[in-house]
Amino acid sequence: MAELGANLLIETLKTLEDGTLGRMPQYHDIMTYDPMLTKEMGIINWADKAVDIVNRIHGLNPWPGCSTAVEGGRLKLLRAEVAQGAGQPGEVITADPKVGLVIAAGEGAVCITQLQAPGGKPMNSKDYLRGHPMAVGTVLKEEISHD
């Protein structure tokens, strides 16, 4: 693949240099604009499908990043993958230092593989759970309620 890419780059640079590189018009009637990224876009809605949550986590990393509310602040979610499991959206269905952190989504579940605690360094979820036990059945929310 690298060799193919290198050859294509050389070919493209040659056509650019000799002026034969073809131009392609933009179709203004079908183009769309995306809004500027904001921190609010990174707040996880656990009612979304697991695959959408995982894509959001990967797509918004490193900035603005994704997070969810936990006691003590916001937990940054850095890497994740779709997992098996079911429960109420946001419900912790696995919190085992040997297995990791799995949270139910609106459809499916999300295994958080790397995260960052408030004021901490990025770490894998297994290491996080060794120092910050989480009860299975805890429901993570977009924001912490102060009842």
Task: Locate predicted features.
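Active-site-proximal loop/hinge segments within enzyme catalytic domains
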Residues: 1-83
